[in-house]
Amino acid sequence: ISVFAGTNDYNKARPIGSFYTEPVEEKVIVGYDGEEPRYGTRKHRDLIFDTATFCGSINFVLGHLRTLYPTKPIYLMTPIHRAYAKFGGDNIQYDELYANSGGVFFDEYVETVKKAANVWACPLIDLNALCGLYPRNDTHAALFFANESTDRLHPSAGGHKRMAQAIAHALRAVSPYDHE
């Protein structure tokens, strides 16, 4: 199972949010071998499943996948780099060097996917770094993206091939599972 997330969340300015709340609870903090227990406060993490945020959406999806497919490996993939795309008068998407309408830069979504891999114990395939696609470069845009002038967001067949090669290599390198 693979989850490839982040680019549409960036474009739609979905707030990053947090993976957890951290309420403070009173707990037994000391109590050994017949001693009277002593109480104190400790922060505790509770996962957030609010799909209004990027982190909450990731938690929601991965929570369901872990429940529905407990024996299957789940791989998280970072989004590839992105650049200018114009799909019509009301659908213009800027490149990753611009913050989205919420003031958040693209690389923050990339880093959030990386963090999610650790939160959910999922192998990470960092396509943002591994596949070598960089649509802000004119030569790369011409070779590996749908249209050098209007779509530096979606890979061409050549771009998909590079992504597939990176994924195949990463699966061999990071997979701790038997593949059935």
Which residues make up each language-model segment?
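Structural recognition of the beta-strand scaffold that forms the well-ordered cores
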Residues: 1-5, 9, 73-78, 123-126, ...
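The substrate-binding groove and active-site-proximal loops of carbohydrate-active enzymes
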Residues: 40-55, 97-101, 151-154
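Conserved active-site region of classical short-chain dehydrogenase/reductase
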Residues: 55, 59, 161
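A short helix->loop->beta-strand "cap" motif at the edges of active sites that frequently abuts
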Residues: 67-73
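Oxyanion-hole/transition-state-stabilizing segment in secreted/luminal serine hydrolases
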Residues: 1-52, 82
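Generic structural signal for well-ordered alpha-helices
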Residues: 58-62, 110
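Catalytic His-Asp segment of secreted/periplasmic serine-dependent ester chemistry enzymes
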Residues: 79-180
